[in-house]
Amino acid sequence: MGKHLVKNGFTSDYTRWIYHGESDRGREEVLRQRIDEFDDDAGVGDMLNDYHEAHFEEARREEEPEATAKAYYEMLSAAQQPLHGHTKVSQLDAIARLMAVKSQFSLSRDAFDIKLTVFGSLLPVGHILPKSMYEAQKLLRALKMPYEHIHACPKGCILFRKEYAEAKYCVKCESSRFLEVDCGDDQKKQLAIPMKVLRYLPFIPRIQRLFMTEESMKQMTWHKNGRRYNPEKLVHPSDAEAWKSFDAIYPARALEARNVRVALATDGFNPYGMAAAPYTYWPIFVIPLNLPPGVLFQRHNIFLSLIIPEHLGNNMSVYMEPLIDDLLHAWEEGVWTYDRSTKTNFKMHVWYQYSLHDLPAYGIFSGWCVHGKFPYPVCKESLKFIWLSKGGKYSSFDKHRQFLPPDHPFRRDIKNFTKDVVVTAPAPPMMIGAAVRAQLDALEVNNEEGGFLGYGEQHAWTQKSCLWKLPYFDDLLVPHNIDVMHTEKNITEAIFGTIMDIPDKTKDNVKARVDQATLCNRPQLNMVPPRAGKSWRKPKADFVLTRAQRKEVLEWFQMLMFPDGYAANLKRGVNLATMQINRLKSHDYHIWLERLLPVMVRGYVPEHVW
């Protein structure tokens, strides 16, 4: 009875909140599922059946698979024989399960060899289980994906490939390609240890694998053949104007539903943790956009393509050379790919659709600095931010009103925005495509300081992105996108810090009060002059909580009960000593903004603020 109640609860019609982290299975089922993950041969069996249908049924076969796919299928066929005479488990199934266990539990090579030896001694005579990891890897060789280690200049000037493949020193800065040791008498010797290595995993073979089974092949044409239950809603990138615009410009490419559009995503991270010395890796991921919405952003459909061993900066174009070369080849010449569903080979074309990242990476990818006087990369210098004299920085305050409809009441509001200012100007024009390329081509290089002449005064270009090498880049309406979760986290963090009046995190500081007194008509927020030897006083704003109210809010957070995995950090991170919540992540801020903010401040702030 106890197990039944734990599993099913007291109410028979209780709705389980599985999308909020609540489990819908008992622990026994979860454990059994983990075990079954290493005992499921359905996927391998389906691939073998697909191969036999394609290779032996002459009535259905139209073409032989192309070379890579053929080697892949032949490996599967050779590995289909049973492990021994008394089982249906194939050699490939057994190796795949054992390799999965090795990966999950981080077994060493020696430990894996011993495990194979022990298992082999328990099997009947004549079994074909490999005796070592070397033999297992040899059998699985056709399953492996290619990867490259490319030596790079320590300063990021060049990659030692193509015409520089044999060079030992950088042709631009003369830095050594390899580690040097002092041999005395001012002599140095190069060791066979590269100073910097770029790791590249070609993405095209990984995309080709998606066409080798019928199920994934159908998913790769969903963008064109998939059913939309509500055509008025945007449920997929193919429903957007940018996708349709590209189809209209290149109808021949768009006609073939199997052609693939990809997105690039990147972000920097410290592999050694936040407490370690500052060091940044920049992985670049490739995402096929043809897939249905439900599987588009699943982990196995996001391909790691580049691992850049430093902050991107202005060297992004150098490190992305291999990726751009593959994109150029896939666009201009195409790649022969085997289609499992039609048993034919077709020439697959792949092209870049857009990138996805946070705002700083947006500036790196686009080549336009997102800080300073012209931080808006779409309108560029047409939208000039204002300078805050006390804050010592540029601000976008009140620049949003020009984007509103001409009859919007906010345009005529002279009280709640910049005082005594009515906005009649239209929205600045968006610069895209050929106009941006023409502006880039007209820039003059600053030979003395580097960069381009006029930077910071006339424009904010820091570099010409390597993406402009793509012949179709001019025709992309939205070549770059900002990650919503990053943006939401930054905005929510600022709101939370301001409401809770957290030092160094609140936007309602003394400098902001002085600047708003100059710009706005809000006398209740102006700094109060000193009296009788006292210092300047900052009046409390209606949207800021008192210390007692902040304590009540944090104690309320500690009492909140959430489903497992939903927002546990909000409770665990409360620190009453500092009146803060620590270790919050993007998802936690999302929950706070969407669910908790209205409840948290109601009753503490005036009705017009709430």
Where are these regions (language model features)?
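A structural signal for the principal folded core domain
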Residues: M1-W610
